[in-house]
Amino acid sequence: MKKRAIVLLSGGLDSATVLAMANADGFETYALSMRYGQRHSSELEAAKKVAAALGAVRHEIVDLDLRKFGGSALTDDALDVPTDGVQSGIPITYVPARNTIMLSLALGWAEAVGARDLFFGANAVDYSGYPDCRPEYVAAYETLANLATKAGVEGERIRVNAPIINMTKAEIIQAGVRLGVDYGLTVSCYKADDAGRACGVCDSCRIRKAGFEAAGVPDPTRYV
């Protein structure tokens, strides 16, 4: 029987690449997305298409409305998504504890289906402003996962994989192209419309556009 992995899948470029990488590593992949009240909800439609295209065994979308807490431009309509260029520091698009919340959901599903590997698209190179995308965070969460689960206590080590954490956006795109990822299916924009068309000026769009240019790969993104 093939080993199983839970892959966090937002519908964006990074997580699509990570799903393809997990497949290439020989895993039977289970894709997990979250409807957390993000204003760019069209990314979930993208996630469905990516999961199907890359052959995930299952794709689950969990509802957990983080708009009740606010604190991020992605979940609070009173906060504007920045469009004036990438700044230093933790950006207002940081969703409080989002990766911890999503990895915890993935960890629960992993135990339920006998998976011992979690994959997610943390990246600390092109955009290092998010505290839950750092290598030390990944290592700390893996420690927690093995302390907090039946599988971990019984010696079936759980691994938290962040295969693109030290890659540039161009390197990620080039790797995905080699693995057959159709980036035209993905949505990265923080302000994408209901059709998945990108604004072209938010931080995520700027980084994505620069990545395709640096990679020498045609940008398939649909812009408003």
Swiss-Prot record:
Pathway: Purine metabolism; 7-cyano-7-deazaguanine biosynthesis. It holds the Pfam family QueC. One of its GO terms (molecular function) is zinc ion binding. It is an enzyme of class 6 (ligase). Its EC number is 6.3.4.20. The keyword Membrane does not apply. Binds 1 zinc ion per subunit. It catalyses: 7-carboxy-7-deazaguanine + NH4(+) + ATP = 7-cyano-7-deazaguanine + ADP + phosphate + H2O + H(+). InterPro entries: QueC, Rossmann-like_a/b/a_fold. One of its GO terms (biological process) is queuosine biosynthetic process. Zn(2+) binds at C189, C199, C202, C205. Its cofactor is Zn(2+). ATP binds at L9, S10, G11, G12, L13, D14, S15, A16, T17, V18, L19. Keywords: ATP-binding, Ligase, Metal-binding, Nucleotide-binding, Queuosine biosynthesis, Zinc. Catalyzes the ATP-dependent conversion of 7-carboxy-7-deazaguanine (CDG) to 7-cyano-7-deazaguanine (preQ(0)). Belongs to the QueC family. This is 7-cyano-7-deazaguanine synthase. The gene is queC.
